[in-house]
Amino acid sequence: MNVGGDLVIRDACHADKTAMPFANVGGNVDLRGASLADIDLSGASVAGELRIDGQKLAACPKSSGDPDVLNLRNARVGTLLVADDALTAPRRLRLDGFAFARVGGFEGETKSQLRGRSIEWWDRWARLDPDYSPTSYAQFAAAFTNSGHRDAASDIRYLSRERERETACKESWLRGSCLLQTALGSVAGYGIGSHTFVVLRWVLVFWLAGAALLWLTVPAARHKGAIWCFCASLAQLLPVIPINKELTEFFNDPERTRLKGWQVFLFSALGVVGLALGAILLLAVSGLTHSS
């Protein structure tokens, strides 16, 4: 189907499938207020705006109680316009391969939808497609970046990775991909923007735990003072960063003159934890585990 101008389906009612795959529209497509049980715009090309809201015709009959379906797989539109009430109506989306250049407001509306809505709002809208597709999140991230909102772009990429993790863990939480994605997200925020700094929280927790263990259970360490205990704990937690040879040598006590066996084990484990945190951070920022 080829339409040179606008395609207005506003306030339409149709209980059966509306098939318009690979439609070529030179203007806008207006679906506001339309009650369409199943509209197929897969592969469509819209030069202008695709307008969507959550309004439905109350008197429009439906053949079933299932949510309406809007199929936008592999469709391309110039501008995506989604009304604030789009989350209120029962609807399912199909967004795999859906691409858009801009996100904006309805005619006469000057406030950008990107600035006026939270990142979580767009995440909920993307979740109207029960099947996770990274494409829609990547499109939103590009739109945020192009509008100068780089932090928001990082946030939407983070939510995309979170949904990727949820999808992997839904299949089986024992799968390697689920465990790896969980570690990358909880320890290093997937290496995305400011979310990466969550690793500092883990470093702080284990650093303070090691310092407290030295101060409370190792008399030789307590004798050297609290600051020394903090420095020694940090040196053991971050063995790849040389701080002071005296600090690292303190934990090398084969004669057990300073440390008991269980203490040696715990401080050795602290070093392993530090190496694990560093490895997870490196994997996260490298992007090697990001399949999308």
Stretch-by-stretch model annotation:
Residues 49, 194-198:
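Juxtamembrane interface helix immediately N-terminal to a transmembrane segment
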Residues 281-292:
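Juxtamembrane boundary at the C-terminal end of a transmembrane helix
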Residues 1-183:
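N-terminal leader/targeting and pre-domain segments
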Residues 177-195, 219-280:
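Pore-loop/selectivity-filter region of tetrameric P-loop cation channels
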Residues 199-211, 272-276, 280:
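Alpha-helical transmembrane spans of integral membrane proteins, capturing the lipid-embedded, hydrophobic core
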Residues 43, 74, 204-237:
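Outer-pore turret/helix-boundary of cation channels
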Residues 153, 213, 285:
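Hydrophobic, well-ordered secondary-structure elements that form the walls
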Residues 161, 217-218, 290:
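Hydrophobic/aromatic-lined pockets within catalytic cores
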